[in-house]
């Protein structure tokens, strides 16, 4: 019976050939009917065996009386039995596949319609994987079934664009060593310009000796700070030697005019009355009796009238002065 079925149920079987083979002998029709029932009878045992296999795997940890090797052999035997029954079902079903192919043209020409509920026709074809990102790895190759894979992702485009721009940015950077090297030269050039802009006023600088002026007038006396109304000379009133030489003729005229307008009331100073007390009295009298504000008196005139000396410097006899009678305890 099997040989007869294999002889008629071949590939590319047409509906006319099947009808001619079935009508030629009654036994051919019974053979086809028995083979279909045998194949159908293999489905239920296979389902029961598959359910038993799942139950064994789920309760494998509860089999405490068996060793791990025995558990492995139990699962292996169930799996081999399941595989054998499934293989037999597939073999019988594939033998009936040419018969199932004739059902479509028969349903088109006949009033009775037959549609197979189960078929293994796609089993011989390679299974196409689904385009699911959950288990598929991203690949550069694109297939005809997944046209969306041909387009690059936005992240890849951004990364490629950034990779192209990054080298250009590095080449456009300028070295920073030039600015660091220029800073010492700029600072060095600024320092001489500040020194050459004008004379620096140093507080407490010793005034230079001028021609035609007494050395006593240029010496800074410590008694200047003891005077009740005299203010110490500010550092910014000091002048350079060149400016002092230019102002000397004008100062001499002012001193001569002041000497004529304001006669000295303190009398002529001699070695007899040159004491620290007389010097203090002369300095206080000069500041109070002048009647002119200190700001109106020129700075050089105040320097010439220090310690109550007369403005006419030429009349002083320096050789006749005796400084031995000065009380140095006051200065200490």
Swiss-Prot record:
Its main location: nucleus. Residues 125-206, 221-242 are annotated as: Disordered. One of its GO terms (biological process) is regulation of transcription by RNA polymerase II. GO terms for molecular function: transcription coregulator activity. Residues 132-143, 155-166, 184-200 have a biased composition (Low complexity). GO terms for cellular component: mediator complex. Residues 144-153 have a biased composition (Polar residues). Keywords: Activator, Nucleus, Transcription, Transcription regulation. It is found in: Nucleus. InterPro entries: Med3 (IPR020998). Belongs to the Mediator complex subunit 3 family. Component of the Mediator complex. Component of the Mediator complex, a coactivator involved in regulated gene transcription of nearly all RNA polymerase II-dependent genes. Mediator functions as a bridge to convey information from gene-specific regulatory proteins to the basal RNA polymerase II transcription machinery. Mediator is recruited to promoters by direct interactions with regulatory proteins and serves as a scaffold for the assembly of a functional preinitiation complex with RNA polymerase II and the general transcription factors. This is Mediator of RNA polymerase II transcription subunit 3.
